[in-house]
Each structure stands twice: as structure tokens, then as C-alpha cells.
Amino acid sequence: MNKYTVMAAGLVLSLGLVAGCGSSDGAEAGKAPEKGASDAPKDAPKAGGPVYSGPAIPGLADKQAWSLPRADAIDLGDTFLFVKTGAGEYASGGGSKDDPLDGTTGLLHSTDQPGPVELEFRDVKTGAVRKTLKVTTERVAATTWRDGVPAFEVRSSSTTESDGLSAEGTTTTITVYGSDGAELGKAEHEGDTPFHVHEGHLIEQADQATLQLTPIGGGQPRKVTCGGLQASCSFDPRNKDIDGGSGHAPLITGKYTFHVNNGSTYETDPEELVMSDLATGKKVWSSADVTPPKGVELDDKGVRTSGSIRVLDVRDGRILTAWGAGAFLTDTWVTATYDLASGKQIGGSTRYAYEDFPGDTINTEGSSVFSPDHQLAAAATERGSTVWQLADGTEVWAQKEGEKAMTPLRFSPNGAVLYGTTEESDDTVLAVDARTKKVLVKDLPEDNVPLSARQSGYGYVSTDAGFFVFPAAG
């Protein structure tokens, strides 16, 4: 497991297993926000929060764009969502075991009992209030709608008491909203079994080898089953992957879904990742149908000696993969990109021995952190950070023997700066030039490591002093 994943989680995405949470507009969750909603006037004032007085942050402009008092927010693309409680204070997220690994907010608001809150939609660049929505809820959390569109979900629950013979029953209503506060879809979940909300679907464990994907807003459920004798598959909300033995991939990516074949220790064939059409189940791509990249060890029959494989990303007709290098090279991975239509490898490949950390609670072996523009990737190798180009696998730079090994955390909004930690800097972070490795700052407080706002290119930090938004450095 890679040490950087634990560090990233410590600095702070998906949704929790908490049932019986939600929102309601009036008495009914998911109801059109007629009385509880208001569109902000065109002359709505900008945010008037504190002035940032912390250290300069490499990768961000010197002057903040706007700020608020202490708060956390859900990034909805061009909008930030804040939750204001009945006491008038902004909610602070984090603390959920299922929060995203990238440090962004997953669970923003959660209480044992429903209560009134105000949802506040602010423009990322100016801080101006675009809309407010009053609801009564127990839970507000980040999610995604179809094709990865940023969204948030609210839940409400009701309990049917036993009549003396029947069992007590719980119904949870889940409503998903978009960045403009409009309802995208609603669903109900019966019982108290755990579930997740992802890509416009309810994700549930149907049995040991099967996940059930139920479209929110209507539609036939789809079952994703991993193959193999006594195969086991599960969904991890922290990185949105399907986990099947030594095979890992995004459960849903756009119009596709993945499952794992030979996902069992009882299988002799290596794990196979299969991508299928989400609507029809028709196979679109399989790792078994492409040639493993150079550097992957094969036996005398041409079969991979390691079953470890993962899909890191699918976009623009390309699939980024990571392959276990060999049966006895458990921490060494080879990364390669394939054309979806032809199955041919695009560009070269990278081969690195990754830093292993047994304390990891999530499987991210062979993973890297990506710049927001997906131009660069940074891997946590045995000698420290290595940066490489996603397009062709070309190495940009790598730490040398004798240097203090840096574990990469994330890139700046413009991709120009890489932030990371060393064993000697648990509470502070290094900031280095992503292209040259030049150290820009060696003691940035961990709370001041910025997150990247989707689409806008702005960066933001949430500290005890406030919530601060900055343009990217020019």
C-alpha cells in the first residue's frame, strides 16, 4: 500500500454508510424547494470574511479572492455549497471514515436528529451568494450525478413501528441536487442495510460477489458480479473503486462499469478487469484482450505471473492502467495507457517500486496523484517522489538516493506545484516545482495545503482562521 494515501487522508473523498439521514423541504424530503428556496438577487454582496494572514502558498496568488469565517464546503464545479446551521454557524465536514482520499469534503453535515439548516450556494470566483435553500435534514454529503457531474445528496428517514407482529421498518429518502440547487433525482431505500450514493445510483452489496446499482430517479437495477470460485467484490467509497481480489478499477466511469474476473485466491489465472456498458452490460474492453506493457513478467506460457492490476482512469477514449510487475515483485508496478477502440498501447510505460506502508486501510497500490489538468502524475516510490507525464509515460524527474524521500500529496490548481511530506515533516509540507523539483517552501502547515476547485482553477484552504479562496498563481 502507498504511504501517500494515508497522509492524504490525514490532511483532511465518498459517502458514508449512515442510514436514516436526509433532508426535507417542509415535511417531505426531495420536494421541490418552493418555499424553502430563494434565488440570490443580482446585486448580492460578495463574501466578507477575514483577511488571510497565513504563510504564502506556492501555486496560489498572493491575494485572496474572498473568504468566510471557519467553514468547509462541497465543491460543485463553479459553485461551493455551504451548510449553515440553526445557530447561524457554517458546518465543518470531515471525520467520516468514508471521506474521500483526496482531502475534499465528503460528509459536510450529519446529526442524530433532523434539524433545520440553510444550504448556501456561492460562486467559486467571487463568493457571491447565488441561491439559498432551507431544508430539514440529518445529512448533507458530496456525491456525483451521471457522467461524474458534481452533486450533493440529502437524506431523510422515517420509521414504521411494529404492530406487535411485524418488524419495525425504516425508509430512507435520498434526494440528489445539482450545483444550481435543482433536484436531479430521488430514490427510497427500505431497511437499515448500508448503501452508498455514486454517479446517480444507489450502490448496495447484493452478495459476496455482486454489487447492485439502482438508478436514482427510476430505471432497472443493474447487478455487477465478479467472476471466480468464491469471488469477492466490494465498493470502496473513499476512492470509488470496485475491489475484487488483486483487481481494482472505478466501479462506474461515465457510461461504463467495471467488474473483476478470476477475483479469488482459489483461481490460478490472473485477475482480469472487464469494462462493460452500464446500460446493456455488453463488454467494451478487457485487460485480457490487450498486451501487457514491457516490464510485466510473463511465464513460459505468456501468462502474467502477477494477478495484480488496476485501472487508474478512463477519459478521452483512453484507459490508464497499472500492472503488477511480477509474482515476487509485490511493490513494483508498470503503468501504461491503452486506446479504447483499438486496444493498442499509447506511448511508453513507467515502472516503479512503490513505497509500501502496511498501515494502509485502503488498496491504492500502483496509484499516483494527478495534476488537475491530467498532464502530470506523481508516484510514491521507494526513493521518494517521481513525476511523469500521463500522455506518454515520460519521466519528468525522480528523487535520487540520499535525498529525503518525499511522499506526494497533491498538485496545485494550475499543476505547477507538487506538495508532499517527508518522515521528518509530519506536521508540515514541502512545496516543490512540479517540473524541476526545486523546493519552493519546506515548512507549509498541513492546513494550508490547498485543494483545487473543479473547473474554475481556483484553490482554497480551510483553517481555524477561516475559509479562503485564491486564484491560481499567474
Describe each model-derived feature in a short phrase:
Residues 18-71, 82, 474:
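N-terminal low-complexity, Pro/Thr-rich disordered segments
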Residues 68-75, 134-141, 183-195, 226-233, ...:
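Short coil/turn segments at the loop-to-beta-strand junctions that recur within blades
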Residues 74-77, 84-87, 99-101, 141-149, ...:
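Blade-terminus and WD-like Trp-Asp/Gly-His loop motifs, strongest in beta-propeller folds
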Residues 108-116, 160-171, 204-208, 264-270, ...:
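Short, solvent-exposed loop/turn segments at conserved positions within beta-propeller repeat blades
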Residues 123-161, 172, 183-191:
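Blade-loop segments of beta-propeller domains
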Residues 124-127, 178-182, 215-219, 277-281, ...:
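Short loop/turn segments that connect beta-strands within beta-propeller blades
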Residues 200, 207-213, 217-388:
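Acidic, serine/threonine- and glycine-rich low-complexity intrinsically disordered segments
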Residues 435-474:
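Blade-level signature of beta-propeller repeat domains, shared across WD40, Kelch, NHL, RCC1
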